[in-house]
């Protein structure tokens, strides 16, 4: 399963990307996460269906210092060959 998600709310400046990388690594999920200029956090999640669903559920709360107001989830069709979960440059 491959999912592209965009998380809105108080999600920048609160450690959300590092929190998400840690949770993804715990669940053996690959992909990336980055801040968007719009103030959102964007991520690509690749892995087991159940584990990705669990991670998306965790993202609805986020780390204790965040306040998530919305998550947009889309299927991702393109190939992604990296077998790690990375924090990448802002967009």
Predicted features by range, described:
Residues 1-91:
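Intrinsically disordered, low-complexity, mixed-charge
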